[in-house]
Amino acid sequence: MTRTLAEALLLIFTTLSAGTVTFVATVLQPAMNDLDEAAFARFLPSLYRHAVRSVYAVGTSTVPFVAMIPYFIVYKVEHPWFVAGLACFTLASTASKIMNLPIYRRVAELKSDEVAKLREERRKLQGANHVRALISFVSVLLMAVQFAY
């Protein structure tokens, strides 16, 4: 496999993952904001449960990590823009684990009548989703820049 093909495949999966994250931040999050707190408390655990079982969601977020290993073994770090994009992708995923997962857990533990706490968690989730989407978008841009050289 040529380096260009390997990078193109990595870019495709990274772009698919970034698209999913951007959809969550720009479409699904505003829809969650329209829900009352009790409905949000029911919806978010269901969304999380379905997301972790989704072949698409898990695949597009996992394939780049798995593919990075042979990429770095074979091609090292000779394409700095591409490597920077992979680093941003890793950062976006790490940010998701650090920021989003605790929110999912807290919302699942809250009762539907804890309106103020649910409202605050939803606000935090919106911020976390936007951060993750922005970093994911930057990762795709950085990786794509490599193809201009």
Regions found by a protein language model. Give the residues of each.
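A cytosolic-side transmembrane-helix exit/cap motif
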Residues: 99-111
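Interfacial loop at the N-terminal end of multi-pass membrane proteins
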Residues: 2-10, 14-61, 108-123
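Mid-bilayer segments of alpha-helical transmembrane spans in multi-pass integral membrane proteins
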Residues: 90-98
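Interfacial segments of alpha-helical transmembrane regions
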Residues: 2-15, 64-67, 76-91
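Core segments of transmembrane alpha-helices
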Residues: 57-71, 132-141
